[in-house]
């Protein structure tokens, strides 16, 4: 919650070119660090850092459906978190999760092939390896954002600490 409050407004302003309509930052009244289970409803939220440091997934136990949010996207995910090794681990966790159906916020029903392609893309970005343009299939803007943002988030905390209130 404190991270959301601290960085939320800054991120909204920084990413305005990607907004569709107006956005208001509303902080949650319940947070969790590992899992949040609603046993009566057969619903479980699981901390799954990757797309952001505070990403989570939601498992509907009754229907065996895993909602992965923005963690998996076709053809490539937005990389807005500096720990890409953790992101890859989260995607491996999702790939091996025993759900009958996995649903992405932007890509609908997904399969392990897409998850593997997302992992491979993240690994290439992490290691600075060349990426064939066919991998991001017409999503050059997302790819360029990922490469540029990778540098930004790598040094964000250091710059924020040095500049304090002048950072924004």
Regions found by a protein language model. Name each.
Residues 1-49, 53-118:
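Metallo-beta-lactamase
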Residues 10, 32, 38, 45, ...:
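Phenylalanine-focused residue identity feature
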Residues 3-16, 95-101, 109-168:
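Accessory terminal helices/loops
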Residues 19-28, 32, 53, 103-107, ...:
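Short flexible/disordered coil segments
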